[in-house]
């Protein structure tokens, strides 16, 4: 079977100055063995994800935006799916936990000829895996990655620079 359940909701204030959107998903799929040989052609999947995005207008031409998401996913293929992977003849198994988010501030002049953006974001990934055969205890692995990014951008729009409209981005 393959069961996929989703949820989405959004709300914006009457003034339009603030809003939030949330989502969630849960998926469960059984492993599929097409030819009956005891080995899956499609792996077991169990995943859940949740997240949100919100904004707040700090002025007529400025806003703060925040975003966050979490994903948790387990996959297992091979044979003997109810046993630990090192007890199977062939097994591929991954278990991920991923968190990410961002925060940004945008401001512009009334005519949008001057725009400024500052942002920061992150993603944290934790992964446990097994890729092995013949009951190999050394086929387990783990990975942990943290990614950070931050920056600023300024854009000035010229109605005419030399002979045509242009934008300068710094």
Where do the PLM segments sit?
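Flexible loop and strand-edge segments within Gram-negative outer membrane beta-barrel domains
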Residues: 29-49, 57, 61-116, 122-145
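One face of beta-strands
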Residues: 7, 22, 75-79, 148-150, ...
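Hydrophobic, lipid-facing positions within transmembrane beta-strands of outer-membrane proteins
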Residues: 3-9, 18, 48-52, 97-103, ...
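Outer-membrane beta-barrel translocator/receptor signature
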Residues: 1-35, 43-50, 61
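Short loop/turn motifs that connect adjacent beta-strands in outer-membrane beta-barrel proteins
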Residues: 14-18, 60-63, 108-115, 158-167
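Membrane-embedded beta-strand positions of outer-membrane beta-barrel proteins
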Residues: 20-24, 52-54, 66-68, 116-120, ...
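Outer-membrane beta-barrel pore domains and translocons
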Residues: 1-2, 12, 25-27, 69-71, ...
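Transmembrane beta-barrel domains of outer membrane proteins
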Residues: 8-14, 23, 53-57, 104-110, ...
